[in-house]
Curated annotation (Swiss-Prot):
This protein's name: Putative ankyrin repeat protein FPV031
Intervals holding ANK repeats: 23-55, 58-87, 92-124, 125-158, 163-195
Source organism (scientific name): Fowlpox virus (strain NVSL)
Keywords recorded for this protein, A-Z: ANK repeat, Repeat
UniProt keyword Repeat present: yes
PANTHER family: ANKYRIN REPEAT DOMAIN-CONTAINING PROTEIN 39, ANKYRIN REPEAT DOMAIN-CONTAINING PROTEIN 39-RELATED
Pfam family for this entry, one: Ank
Length: 341
């Protein structure tokens, strides 16, 4: 009965409100705004256009609306039924991820990233989701998650007077020290990495910002001290802890580290500025360790009946298995093992 009541309510809204047309697309938009999950599910089954953009205000799709209001169950429902995750609104060019970040909706951000949302797509102002996160003072967890999913701190917006502002430029104007510190440490990490992002003009701009600003210089000095601490920790005869951290090489760390990993896991307590990024590195490491064990068990069970076959997964050397897993990211492992996002 609640389903019928909800359907009648939104039908009444669409009928009485002159800004809506009486059709299934309008019903879907209103049902999404009201978080009427059963009604949305019903309309989706009836073949409504799931990527329809409203003709009022910001021209948002149902996915954008659900992301804006943190209706994460609806976000999952829409994505699983064909919603275009990187679709841009006609008015502002925002994507669902822009809107989720702007409203500090952590669960929705996680879901969108898991489903492949582009962290570097720009809106009409040239803002990436990372720009939005800094502008609207999003939680540090969201900013860390964006960086983990390859958000580029060196992309510049459409500001004409300064040939474009990076997220670090904006963070300095917003004066949030925690965000500034995180972005500076990320820029310095990139400088030591093999990432192509450190070959761009935006990266050169960010480096100059750090060099020319005394406050940022102090942060950079602490970063360099943290780097020296990590370089003192040998992982094997070839690599230090910093070598693995700077390129986020959790697979190599998994292969090299012994069973007692408490020293590596708790090393963040020895760091001053890099502690946030290092904690994220270790979180990825720990999560991957669990997922790889689950994935190995899934494959072992799958090939259990074929053990007599020398080409079976179970007969492969561990080195080969490890190499194969390097091509599978954590989100793909979650799908493979049926783990939650």
């Amino acid at each position: 009965m609640p389903f019928l009541i909800e359907l009648l309510r939104i039908t009444g809204i669409v009928t009485l409100c002159p800004k809506y047309r009486l059709d299934r697309n309008s019903l879907l938009l209103v049902a999404t705004k009201r978080n009427y999950i059963d009604v949305v599910r019903y309309l989706v089954k009836k073949g409504v256009d799931i990527n329809f953009q409203e003709t009022i205000r910001d021209n948002l799709t149902p996915l954008m609306i659900a992301s804006r209001f943190n209706s994460h169950q609806l976000v999952e429902l829409l994505l699983n039924n064909g919603a275009i995750i990187n679709q841009r609104s006609l008015t502002c060019g925002n994507t669902a991820l822009h809107l989720a970040v702007k409203n500090d909706n952590r669960i929705t951000v996680d879901i969108l990233l898991f489903h492949g949302a582009n962290t570097n797509i720009t809106n009409n102002d040239g803002f990436t989701p990372l720009h939005k996160a800094v502008i609207y003072n999003a939680s540090i967890d969201i900013i860390k998650k964006l960086l983990r999913y390859k958000a580029d701190v060196n992309i510049r917006d459409n500001e004409e007077e300064n040939t474009g502002l990076t997220p670090l430029d904006i963070a300095m104007s917003c004066n949030n020290y925690e965000i500034i510190s995180l972005l500076v440490s990320h820029v310095i990490r990139l400088d030591y990495s093999t990432c192509m992002s450190n070959k761009t003009k935006g990266f050169d701009h960010n480096k100059k910002l750090v060099k020319d600003n005394k406050r940022l210089q102090r942060i950079a000095i602490h970063c360099l001290k943290d780097i020296e601490k990590m370089k003192q920790v040998s992982i094997n005869s070839r690599f230090t802890l910093f070598d693995l951290f700077v390129n986020n090489n959790v697979d190599l760390l998994l292969r090299c580290i012994n069973k007692d990993n408490r020293f590596i896991v708790n090393f963040d307590k020895k760091l001053t500025v890099f502690n946030i990024l290092y904690t994220d590195f270790i979180d990825t490491f720990m999560s991957r360790h669990v997922l790889l064990n689950k994935a190995s068990k899934v494959l072992e069970d799958l090939f259990l009946d074929n053990d007599s076959n020398t080409s079976s997964w179970n007969n492969l050397p561990n080195e080969i298995k490890d190499h194969i897993f390097t091509y599978i990211n954590n989100d793909e492992l979650k799908i493979m093992t049926g783990s939650k996002t």
